From Swiss-Prot:
It comes from Arabidopsis thaliana (Mouse-ear cress). Glycans are attached at residues 51, 68, 250, 263, 292. Residues 1-20 form the signal peptide. One of its GO terms (molecular function) is oxidoreductase activity. This is Berberine bridge enzyme-like 8.
């Protein structure tokens, strides 16, 4: 009897919520229509849950299958903005109706916070993918890039105008510009030119009052915050003006692998000594995973070295034969190609393929989990051997080591909100991918175990993390009151932004005291 009553009550509440939601949606839509520019109707950009195109729009930019299940909380509405006035209307009406707004650029938020809520409350998504113009000015070596563009589009349209200009951003072409820049995105030219945020010079955004601001109007504090302080906390960035950097007509890339049986331990031990000190033009990432050994029943560790050198093969070989002979690089390992083709190479696309592949926004997706760390001291051989043993035991998680040094060590930790500069040898990305939903709990736990095992080898007090490798294991914010929100926000905020966190909080409090722009890991307001 008790369970029957509970069931009846559940359906009564469900029916009430559904009818209430329907009425609220209608009122919300009326608000959107009346607050947008009639010359640019917003109605075609609105997709309701249950609408024929809703699912395809929602799923188009879901990059992690963990958040594309039947149990995943869905927005009641998506605004796929096609004009800046649609963004203004979304903010105005979201505030008026006290609705949470999620902001999605490319959908690469590893824990889905740009299109999923953990609160259980109704929310809508402002999807920026239609606002993706890339306006390149070769004469000034700058470009205005809307935040709905993907990196592949940015690279392609720069290449169309110049074969010797580039932008030092990430290696994944489907990553959205908005999230990438706002979180301090990096790529394989960071040792030469720094991060994305070190190469922006202006921005246009919509603030909490629906006003469009450029750098001059918003002021240097707010500009500082949106340039590496994380997206979704201060407003909606419409576009960034970026500085383009010079690259030679041809660069050199290589990808070679070594296993434990091929002296991988000695090579990695040497890599950590030299990779952060090599010429700024050279970036050598290493990806470490577990593979079958020479005996099929045995596992071994494989280290794959992937490099970008802003120069020719002869010069590269001269550098590495002198500074890093343990790697054993030979000319046949190297490929000399254009910068735009090197982008394809780093995406595991064969050199010589059409550059138009960079314009493709769709890619195969997996279930995945990512975590991050920073290493400030070299790891001993004994330490490395213990790590290999643990990886073989866990088998699934991988690690990618991304070397620092160069320009990264010359820029102050307070110039942008991104704090991790000098003193860091390399950054670690932990990762696991899988295709079967039933493996989710196991693979996530294996990734966490490797992260936990690495504790003695990485930064401390705080244990540093990279904002763009979103990780809700570091804490989430329920936004239930300013005091608890600040305490919860500090838990993850200090790990992402270190000493810059408090300045971000002050700016957030000044520009959005009502905390309209929020998600589970946004910057909180002062209590």
């Amino acid at each position: 009897m008790k369970y029957a009553l509970i069931l009846v009550l559940f359906f009564v509440v469900f029916i009430w919520q559904s009818s209430s939601s329907s009425a609220n949606s209608e009122t919300f839509t009326q608000c959107l229509t009346s607050n947008s520019d009639p010359k640019h109707p917003i109605s075609p950009a609105i997709f309701f849950s249950g609408n024929g195109s809703y699912s395809s729009v929602l799923q188009a930019n879901i990059r992690n299958l963990r958040f594309n299940t039947t149990s995943t909380p869905k927005p009641f509405l998506i605004i796929a903005a096609t004009h800046e006035s649609h963004v203004q209307a979304a903010i105005t009406c979201g505030k008026r109706h006290n609705l949470q707004m999620k902001i999605r650029s490319g959908g690469h938020d590893y824990d889905g916070l740009s299109y999923v809520t953990y609160s259980g409350k109704p929310f809508f998504v402002l999807d920026m993918f239609n606002l993706r113009s890339v306006d390149v000015d070769v004469a000034s070596k700058t470009a205005w890039v809307q935040t709905g563009a993907i990196l592949g589009e940015v690279y392609y349209y720069i290449w169309e105008k110049s074969k010797t200009l580039a932008y030092p951003a990430g290696i994944c072409p489907t990553v959205g510009v908005g999230g990438h820049i706002s979180g301090g995105g990096y790529g394989n030219m960071m040792r030469k030119y720094g991060l994305t945020v070190d190469n922006t010079i202006d921005a246009r955004m919509v603030d909490v009052n629906g006003k469009i601001l450029d750098r001059k109007l918003m002021g240097e504090d707010l500009y500082w915050a949106i340039n590496g302080g994380g997206g979704g906390s201060y407003g909606v960035v419409l576009a960034y003006k970026i500085n383009l950097v010079e690259v030679p007509e041809n660069v050199t890339v290589f990808r070679i692998s070594r296993t434990l049986e091929q002296n991988a331990t000695d090579i990695i031990h040497r890599w950590q000594q030299v990779a952060p000190k090599l010429p700024d033009e050279l970036f050598i990432r290493t990806v470490i995973d577990v593979v079958n050994g020479t005996v099929s029943s045995q596992k071994t560790v494989r280290t794959t070295f992937i490099a970008m050198f802003l120069g020719d093969t002869t010069t590269l070989l001269s550098i590495l034969n002198r500074r890093f002979p343990e790697l054993g690089l030979v000319r046949s390992d190297c490929t000399e190609t254009s910068w735009i083709q090197s982008v394809l190479f780093w995406t595991n696309i064969q050199v010589g393929s059409s550059e138009t592949l960079l314009l493709q926004r769709n890619q195969p997706v997996n279930y995945l989990k990512r975590k991050s760390d920073y290493v400030r001291e070299p790891i001993s051989r004994t330490g490395l051997e213990s790590i290999w043993k643990k990886m073989i035991e866990l088998e699934i998680p991988t690690m990618a080591f991304n070397p620092y040094g160069g320009e990264m060590g010359r820029i102050s930790s307070t110039v942008t909100p991104f704090p991790y500069r000098a003193g860091n040898l390399w950054k670690i990305q932990y990762g696991a991918n899988w295709r079967d939903e039933t493996l989710t709990d196991r693979y996530m736990e294996l990734t966490r175990k490797l992260y936990q095992f690495m504790t003695p080898f990485v930064s401390k007090n705080p244990r540093q993390s990279f904002f763009n490798y979103r990780d809700v294991d570091l804490g989430i914010n329920s936004h239930n009151g300013k005091i608890s929100s600040y305490v919860e926000g500090k838990r993850y905020g200090k790990k992402y932004f270190a000493g810059n966190f408090e300045r971000l909080v002050k700016i957030k409090t000044r520009v959005d005291s009502g905390n309209f722009f929020r998600n589970e890991q946004s910057i909180p307001v002062l209590p």
